[in-house]
Amino acid sequence: ASVNDLSMVVEVAYRESGVLFTGDLSAEGEPSPLPDVDVLKVPHHGSAQACSDRMLAELTPQVSVIPVGENNYGHPSEQTLERLESAGSEVYRTDECGAVTVRILKDGAIRVKTYLPVEEP
């Protein structure tokens, strides 16, 4: 196991919604069971070892945020992006859209604000 798997994992719950902050976990370090959350801070900048299929099946995030900048590691990996897309999660990358603010409204609706213009696919 990697020292990254000692990352603090924090779930923030508000009414019926949840957000999971995962630090730099790899698939090996994923806790079990996982909560059903609406928003996921993708582990380890979206590395290839982040977000196993099991994790995404248990979490079912509507929104995933990948904090990543220019790097020599190839983060986020194509495999992780494909897993998030297959899980039906809306993905926001800070290298493409700048800072990301996520608000959960009283009715459970999720509002995402990006600080750079985001091109529609």
Q: Which residue ranges define each predicted feature?
A:
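Binuclear metal-ion centers of metallo-dependent hydrolases, dominated by the metallo-beta-lactamase
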Residues: 1-4, 71-121
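Active-site-proximal loop/helix segments of hydrolase catalytic cores
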Residues: 1-76
